Structures are given as structure tokens and as C-alpha cells.
Amino acid sequence: MLFRSIREIASEKAAIIVRGNRAVTGATDRGDALNVIKRAAASVGAPLTIATHGAVRSRGRDGIEVDLPRLGAVRVGLIGRHQAQNAAVALATLDAMREAGIVDVSDDRIVAGFAAARWPGRLELIDHAFGSDDRRDLLLDGAHNEDGAAALAAAVDDLAPHLRDADGECRMGGESRSNRATLIVAAMSDKAIDRIFGELATSPVLRAARLICTTVGEERSSTPEALADAARRAGLGAAVEIAADPQRALDGAARDRGPVIVAGSLYLVGAVRERLMRQGRLPDDGSLDPEATTGSAESRA
């Protein structure tokens, strides 16, 4: 199993910086990432913009509101406080492109674009019908590394007061069947599962959740039993169960009445999204391709 340091990841990403281009980064001093990127840009004479991180003003079901340079308070239609950093990098990139004459886009259009932003399978909140009289929140997230798991844990805690159960109520907390969340997880065996589950277990909501471990049938997929053992070691989930496949996991989740969270693998999230599209419960925007999204998935924040 291969674990790369932040410095190694930064070095790989900095390789795209070439002479004659501008570079924009949201990297910080964590793991020396910023210094690595600075040196790479300087070595080819590429002007480097370091994005100023925006401060989160509010968080809710429909995204976040963040203070961005020059624009002030802007609504971003993506859930998760980590999206403030991504928004700041996006704005800095657009500004650099405008200065270079590559794009001509007004601030009004930029603000509208942030509000309209959507990311299928990444902290995607769906009002889902589990039955004729059972509509509740279904949260899909492809978190499959430590940073992604940390972002999911923080987002779930932020969302907890707003997540709706099968009775249409927002009453997360405690461990009763009416208000605890159900977390469905699958993961590839070559991932740092203990570390990922350790990050998820930092969330009080996820520690108190009913956990259903499943598999997506890929050759690399970890067994539900191995996931259950890792969850117990991490203290993830107040009750831990096993399901042979995602459909049985969803059927099991329907037996409780709390919100449902699906996470740990883009393959799992993609399978659930495809099922919802076939049922007409999601727009048919194409299935989530784990292989096509691997690059962006590895650098979550």
C-alpha cells in the first residue's frame, strides 16, 4: 500500500507548471507544499499567484457563503467548508486569466457561476424517496482518502441541524432510531482504511450512526468484514452491520428513519447515483466514472 507525503504530491502537481504560463495555487505551508510549488514556478520563470483563502460566513443545505477578495460575500452552491478554499483558488485563476486576456467574464457572471456550482457525488444532498411515505435526506460523497474523510466529517456535523429524517424533521442527535444517521460505506483495499475511518470518527454524528459496510464487487474492493473490523477499531458507528451489496445496504438503511449517508468509494457513490437515475429520481447526467475523477479526488480541498 502506497502512502505519499504532501511534499511528494505537491511535487507531482507542480510538474504541470511550464515556462510561459502563469500558475495559481491554494497550497499552504502544510507539509511544505507551498515552498515546493514556489520553487517549481521560480525554476521556469512562471508568475505565481497565491490565492487568499476566503472566510466562511455561513453553512447550510444549499452550500456555503464565503468572503472572497474583491467580491465580498458570495454564495457557493457546494456543501463543505473546504469549498471556501476551492472558491478562492477558482477566483484567483479567473483573475489571472482575465489579466492575460484569455477570458472576458464579468464579476456578476462569476458570482452567478459560484451560486450555480454543482459536483455530482461530492457532498451531494438529495431529497430521496425510500418509500411511498418515506422521504428523507440522502447524502452522497466519494470521500476515499484522509482529506476527503476529514472534509466529510466536518460537513456532516455542519449539516446535522438541517438533515431531514423520514418524518421531514431535522432532529439529529442521540441514538434513537428516529434521528440517528445511517452511514453506508465501501472502500478499495489499497486505501488507508484505518486512517480514513479515523477521520470519519472525529464526527459525533458518524460515531453515533448506524454503520452498514458493503462492497461494490470490484477486484480491489475491501470485504465488508474487513471494513467492519476497521470501523470498530476506529470507533466509527454505534452499531456496525454488513451488507452483501449496495442494494441490500440501501434496503437495510430504509429500516431506520434517519438521514442516510453513502461514502468511502466513488464506485459505491457511482452505483447509487446510476440506480437513482434509472429510477428517474436524479437527472440523467451520466454515471459517475471513478477512473475519470481520480485525479481531482486525490486532492480534495
Q: Which residues does each predicted region cover?
A:
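Short, flexible loop segments at boundaries between secondary-structure elements
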Residues: 216-218, 283-301
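Acidic, Mg2+-coordinating active-site environments of NTP-dependent enzymes
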Residues: 1-73, 87-108
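Surface-exposed, charge/polar-rich loops and edge strands
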Residues: 280
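A glycine-rich beta-strand to alpha-helix segment
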Residues: 248-277
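Nucleotide phosphate-binding/pyrophosphate-handling subdomain across enzymes
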Residues: 8, 70-210
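Beta-strand->loop->alpha-helix junctions that form or flank phosphate-binding loops
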Residues: 25-28, 40-59, 77-81, 105-117, ...
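C-terminal helical cap/extension that packs against the catalytic core
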Residues: 26-45, 49, 60-64, 133-139, ...
